């Protein structure tokens, strides 16, 4: 989900691939360690765009020490990927997986990346009890109430 909090509108509700060691079909195991090939949880701020080995990419700076602060040095960036599509799921039974990056479809990569570039807050969520108790940026009581409604 990509939500414009100012206008309170959903901009995108689309597929996103996670790191290959984060889980098979669903993400459930996260890391802040280089070489883990796992995605990270928590709050990020988007940086600039660049052309990398995966094409158009977006730098992500992790804002939570111990949870995702190594994102930039781990090269955790948002990028497009051919393995993020309904067709890939039909052929393989699930999305492909990245080396830890949030990867979006080639069809939407430009629109999503340029929408989020340069100073957008990005939040990667999973109901991980350690993250929820350690995060200094979350209102965990409010989040707990949200989880109860979902």
What are these regions (language model features)?
Residues 1-99, 106-120, 124-150:
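Cell wall/extracellular polymer interaction/catalysis modules
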């Amino acid at each position: 989900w990509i939500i414009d909090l100012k206008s309170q509108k959903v901009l995108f509700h689309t597929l996103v691939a996670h790191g290959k060691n984060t889980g098979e079909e669903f993400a459930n195991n996260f890391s802040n360690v280089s070489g883990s090939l796992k995605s990270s949880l928590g709050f990020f701020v988007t940086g600039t765009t660049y052309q990398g080995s995966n094409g158009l990419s977006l730098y992500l700076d992790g804002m939570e020490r111990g949870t995702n602060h190594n994102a930039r040095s781990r090269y955790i960036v948002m990028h497009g990927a051919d393995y993020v599509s309904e067709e890939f799921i039909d052929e393989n039974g699930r999305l492909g997986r990245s080396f830890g990056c949030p990867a979006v479809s080639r069809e939407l990569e430009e629109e999503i990346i340029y929408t989020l570039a340069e100073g957008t807050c990005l939040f990667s969520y999973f109901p991980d009890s350690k993250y929820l108790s350690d995060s200094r940026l979350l209102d965990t009581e409010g989040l707990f109430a949200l989880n109860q409604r979902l």
